[in-house]
Design a protein with these regions (language model features):
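ABC-type ATPase nucleotide-binding domains, specifically the catalytic core motifs of the NBD
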Residues: 14, 55, 70, 95-115, ...
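The feature captures the beta-strand-to-loop junction immediately N-terminal to the Walker
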Residues: 35-37
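Helix-to-loop junction immediately C-terminal to a conserved catalytic motif
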Residues: 50
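Conserved ABC transporter NBD signature motif
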Residues: 58-66, 78, 112-117
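Conserved ABC ATPase signature
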Residues: 134-138
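ABC ATPase C-loop
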Residues: 151-152
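Catalytic Walker B motif of ABC-type/P-loop ATPase nucleotide-binding domains
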Residues: 159-163
Length: 237
């Protein structure tokens, strides 16, 4: 059963088309990746799901309901959390204050928010040590953990991850890799877009290749890892 189904999605910025007739499915409990070059349109795809683009056509169906025309503030209320590229933490607020913002739809349940923070700290122990520290003073990797944890505070049904490894040190990339595996094992459905093809194919069950705004390949991640076109274009093999 598909939790998210995108069909014939076309999107543009002003008069510049970015996505062309894109279709994909994310099954309930699945881990799907979209890989491609830096200008392929991957981030635009997630922005469409989050309701952040106006010039779109096609259909985006979440749990049986078309959400293409919903305003952005309605998307998190449905259980869709988006970790954007660039982290976008609130620098003057503490780590814990940033996390609490992610749980705003449950803001009247203080006990649930506390449990949510504890779960994030279990996933990223480093954040527990820095919970009273201003987020703007953290390293890039730690800020990525805050952005990731803030999304999890929503208790989402679908997690959208936009280039979570971008600009991070190899050790932090390994931590993010393990975190993605752990939260997927807990039952969370994930749609990941990632330029690091090797990372994406190592964690996702199924993947799509986006090239110049169009889907050109799809299949089980293991099969794509062995596909000569993917190996040459994206894995440097």
């Amino acid at each position: 059963m598909s939790l998210l189904q995108i069909q014939g999605l076309t999107a543009s910025y002003d008069r510049s088309p970015v996505l062309h007739d894109v279709s994909l499915e994310v099954p309930q409990g699945g881990f799907i990746a979209v890989v491609g070059a830096n200008t392929a349109g991957k981030s635009t795809l997630l922005r469409c799901v989050s309701g952040l683009l106006d010039k779109v056509s096609g259909s985006i169906v979440f749990d049986g309901h078309d959400i293409l025309r919903l305003p952005p503030h309605r998307i998190p209320e449905l259980g869709i959390a988006h970790v954007p590229e660039g982290r976008h933490v609130f620098p003057e607020m503490t780590v814990e204050e940033n996390l609490y913002l992610g749980g705003y739809t449950r803001r009247r349940d203080g006990a649930a928010l506390k449990r949510g923070c504890d779960e994030v700290y279990a996933l990223f122990p480093r954040l527990l040590e820095r919970r009273r520290q201003a987020a703007g003073t953290l390293s890039g990797g730690e800020q990525q953990m805050v952005a990731f944890g803030r999304a999890l505070m929503l208790k989402p049904r679908l997690l959208l991850l936009d280039e979570p490894s971008h600009g991070l040190a190899p050790k932090v990339v390994e931590e993010m890799h393990q975190a993605m595996i752990d939260i997927h094992r807990s039952g969370l459905t994930i749609l990941l877009v990632e330029q690091n093809t090797r990372l994406a194919l190592s964690v996702a069950e199924h993947a799509y290749v986006l090239q110049s705004g169009a889907m050109v390949l799809s299949g089980p991640s293991r099969a794509l890892m062995e596909d000569s076109r993917v190996r040459e274009a994206y894995l440097g093999l």
